[in-house]
Amino acid sequence: MASIEEIAHQIIEQQMGEIVTEQPTGQKIQIVTALDHNTQGKQFILTNHDGSTPNKVILARQDSTPGKVFFTTPDAAGVNQLFFTTPDLSTQQLQFLTDNSSSEQGPNKVFDLCVVCGDKASGRHYGEVTCEGCKGFFKRSIRKNLVYSCRGSKDCIINKHHRNRCQYCRLQRCIAFGMKQDSVQCERKPIEVSREKSSNCAASTEKIYIRKDLRSPLAATPTFVTDSETARSAGLLDSGMFVNIHQSGIKTESTMLMTPDKAVSCQGDLSTLASVVTSLANLGKTKDPAPNSNEVSMIESLSNGDTSYTSVCEFHQEMQTNGDVSRAFDTLAKALNPGESTACQSSGEGMEGNVHLIAGDSSINYIEKEGPLLSDSHVAFRLTMPSPMPEYLNVHYIGESASRLLFLSMHWALSIPSFQALGQENSISLVKAYWNELFTLGLAQCWQVMNVATILATFVNCLHSSLQQDKISAERRKLLMEHIFKLQEFCNSMVKLCIDGYEYAYLKAIVLFSPDHPGLENMEQIEKFQEKAYVEFQDYITKTYPDDTYRLSRLLLRLPALRLMNATITEELFFKGLIGNVRIDSVIPHILKMEPADYNSQIIGHSI
């Protein structure tokens, strides 16, 4: 690669003089030339073709071909012709061309350079001028929330030829040069031409519909929240979150937000709560209670002749007590895994060599785990959405997506040796106490994959429709709306922080090992695990983000907001339309007793 000094010698041979370069000072680059070594050289400054002085021009790259020097402006607008002239802008000029050897990139054509790698740019992508390669790399990394690691010292050279060697440094360079992650969040799948476009619809390029009558050939009627009750509701409209939906039936007070579509058969698929509860319908049937006339009419109006939904509602009424749920899930576990032990092992079982009991000053035995609390295997959080995606978004699809996230969170907790070492009773108590916090963190982590923004906007639309139809009280709607806005604000704040997989794993561990829930046993041991998670978390951030002094504080300050999320409302929004009045608390012990192989083959897939 030719250096400035080599170019200078070439110019001397061409009798153009000697170039002596100085470091950029202020807003200009100074170049001194001298045709004769015995005479004083003239001073030249960089200027535009029209004689005006540019703000700043920097060396973009040096081509391997001798004699080529490429300059560009900081905004990558591209500089094709560079003129060196005297400060008084006299007619004496020394002209350099960026590339005069190519017919495609001649002096009359301006081309942009990628701000990340220096390759030829194809346009402005996500806020900066980049090439197609860096554009696609950045989009994949942000959409899938990929976690990279650097094998070097996190200062790898990123250029056209070496940009694929270190993905970590390449992504950090994309962010450092101003590529906006929020721009990636706004992209959606293209709208089908056959679908009706509404001028009221926001800028989202993906329309998801909810239909009440499966047999209706009509397209969904667009409805939007126009109530000025809160400014935040209008803010959702401005952000392009709302979608076209059909007016949906809603239960009063107990509030089923959307009428269910006909569910795809899920027999034999134990990946979601829907399939588990459906299987229990044949295992845990008791006497058929006679519903009152109001409930029957409401079920008929919601189901619109959908017999599968009617049977699910009947099953919901059959399982009113936790005892029924427990017996049904126990029966299911035995039927699925005869003679096999459950996934949740007793304290210390299978942990030889990793976990040791230490007797303290008192009679309490403390568990000390060798090595880190979390390993690299706990960073990956892979979620597969239900497939195929229905043409019309319905309660079953939302519920199954949420239940897959719930199962995946349970599986993640079970994979931590320290969690299993606490014993089955403590493990169940911890998950029952903090499943809502873990689920909410999962929503933020899977924000893009689950399309959470659209789901929340759908909830808001349905609540607005139900209020207009007098199917829900204003007080109840306000309570649900406040919860939705809390979810929205929390997830948005997490997305803006650009949290990686390691940070999400440690945040979940700190939440999971919280000793302040009443009824927990061995709280001192749980607190020790939480302290260990915090120390490892602090060490990771210090090494990974040495220049971000307050990053740890910002992340930890997001955790108190999780305690403001009402678990009952979360159940109502995401799960009630799928499993009715069966509480998540009653389901958790049976999920933890199931072998992970019975459900994780369906919920584990694409990396988040």
Curated annotation (Swiss-Prot):
Q: Which UniProt keywords apply?
A: Activator, DNA-binding, Isopeptide bond, Metal-binding, Nucleus, Phosphoprotein, Receptor, Repressor, Transcription, Transcription regulation, Ubl conjugation, Zinc, Zinc-finger
Looking at the record, which segments are called Required for interaction with NRIP1?
A: 589-608
What is the location of the Glycyl lysine isopeptide (Lys-Gly) (interchain with G-Cter in SUMO) cross-link? 251
Matches recorded under Gene3D superfamilies: Erythroid Transcription Factor GATA-1, subunit A, Retinoid X Receptor
Sites of Phosphothreonine modification: 221, 223
Query: Where are the stretches annotated Required for interaction with KAT2B?
Result: 1-179
The feature table lists the DNA-binding region at: 111-186
Q: Where is this cross-link: Glycyl lysine isopeptide (Lys-Gly) (interchain with G-Cter in SUMO2)?
A: 251, 593
Q: How does it assemble?
A: Homodimer. Heterodimer; with NR2C2 which is required for chromatin remodeling and for binding to promoter regions such as globin DR1 repeats. Interacts with ESR1; the interaction prevents homodimerization of ESR1 and suppresses its transcriptional activity and cell growth. Interacts with NRIP1 (via its LXXLL motifs); the interaction provides corepressor activity. Interacts with HDAC3 (via the DNA-binding domain); the interaction recruits phosphorylated NR2C1 to PML bodies for sumoylation. Interacts with HDAC4 (via the DNA-binding domain).
Statement: the UniProt record of this protein carries the keyword Zinc-finger: yes
| ZnF locations on chain (NR C4-type) | 114-134, 150-169
Reported function: Orphan nuclear receptor. Binds the IR7 element in the promoter of its own gene in an autoregulatory negative feedback mechanism. Primarily repressor of a broad range of genes including ESR1 and RARB. Together with NR2C2, forms the core of the DRED (direct repeat erythroid-definitive) complex that represses embryonic and fetal globin transcription. Binds to hormone response elements (HREs) consisting of two 5'-AGGTCA-3' half site direct repeat consensus sequences. Also activator of OCT4 gene expression.
* Cited InterPro entries: NHR-like_dom_sf, NR2C1/2-like_DBD, NR2C1/2-like_LBD, Nucl_hrmn_rcpt_lig-bd, Nuclear_hormone_rcpt_NR2, Nuclear_hrmn_rcpt, Znf_hrmn_rcpt, Znf_NHR/GATA
- Report the record's Gene Ontology biological process terms: cell differentiation; regulation of transcription by RNA polymerase II
Q: What GO MF annotations does this protein's record show?
A: nuclear receptor activity; RNA polymerase II cis-regulatory region sequence-specific DNA binding; zinc ion binding
The membrane spanning regions, by residue number, are none
Q: Where is this gene product found?
A: Nucleus; Nucleus, PML body
Which residues does the UniProt record annotate as the domain NR LBD? 353-595
User: One of this protein's Pfam families, by short name?
Assistant: zf-C4
Sorted alphabetically, the Gene Ontology cellular component annotations on this record are: PML body
Principal place of residence: nucleus
Query: SMART domains, from UniProt?
Result: HOLI, ZnF_C4
Name the UniProt record assigns to this protein: Nuclear receptor subfamily 2 group C member 1
Protein family: Belongs to the nuclear hormone receptor family. NR2 subfamily.
- Name positions with the PTM Phosphoserine: 198, 216, 586
After translation, how is this protein modified? Answer: Sumoylation requires both PIAS1 and UBE2I. Sumoylation appears to dissociate NR2C1 from the PML nuclear bodies. Enhances the interaction with NRIP1 but inhibits interaction with KAT2B. In proliferating cells, stimulation by all-trans retinoic acid, activation of MAPK1-mediated phosphorylation and recruitment to PML bodies with subsequent sumoylation, suppresses OCT4 expression.
